[in-house]
């Protein structure tokens, strides 16, 4: 699994003019699924999302997490995180999980997240989504389960 985490003042996902996920302060996570991602990966990566200390405390140090502050998490599927652009100018999307596996894994990841944290919203796999966000910082963190564990 690969994640692009962005600290946001607010973020939302709209599909066909309808808002399907929305948070105020928190983390927007663009989520790319890989072959073999399972509950052990979900647990480790979601713990990173909720425990990463990227919010300021009273002394303006990045010392607080989403869970410390009861902020929201917006999970947005994004297979392009696994793009390979090493050859030519057109990225290849052959890396990462195939669509059926990625859909199931993403939906299971969202289910896991919602069971373990009360403020989780999500986009929809393979939908034409419009993602709006206001970066806060900006703070952007890249996480890859193959490199973290």
Predicted regions span which residues?
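Short beta-strand segments
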Residues: 6, 32, 77, 142
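Compact, glycine-rich, soluble single-domain proteins
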Residues: 19-70, 83-111
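Residue-level signal for inorganic ion chemistry
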Residues: 45, 76, 139
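Glycine/charge-rich, flexible interdomain linkers and switch-proximal surface loops
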Residues: 58-73, 121-133
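Short, low-complexity, polybasic intrinsically disordered segments
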Residues: 93-96, 136-149
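Short, conserved loop-to-beta-strand elements that form functional interface hotspots
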Residues: 103-132
